[in-house]
Swiss-Prot record:
It comes from Burkholderia thailandensis (strain ATCC 700388 / DSM 13276 / CCUG 48851 / CIP 106301 / E264). SUPFAM superfamilies: ClpS-like (SSF54736), Ribosomal protein L7/12, oligomerisation (N-terminal) domain (SSF48300). It holds the Pfam family Ribosomal_L12_N. The keyword Ribosomal protein applies. One of its GO terms (cellular component) is cytosolic large ribosomal subunit. This is Large ribosomal subunit protein bL12. The gene is rplL.
Amino acid sequence: MAIAKEDILAAVEGMTVLELNELVKAFEEKFGVSAAAVAVAGPAAGGAAAAAEEKTEFTVVLAEAGSNKVAVIKAVRELTGLGLKEAKDLVDGAPKPVKEGVDKAAADEAKKKLEDAGAKVEVK
């Protein structure tokens, strides 16, 4: 009996980020594929025009945890949904990206939350 797509989607929907990461790694090993993003070539001419466009995706980088590391770990967990150990490892390994590919409003909100917790944050 085959498993329906809806059943698979429901199972994936209920997984944590860590479980999804392990699932992707298992797919990579089982089928010999890579989950890396495909690079898309930009326009051949008009490089200056591309630079003039307003940036739409931002990366929030935790530059330094600061003195109140516990509050920063809590803020990272709240923003990312990571578990305690993963959030602590991210904070201990600063500078590291906390959120990637988010819009300006989400980046500013994440920056404010982390700075309120005592961290030094960069938005790139």
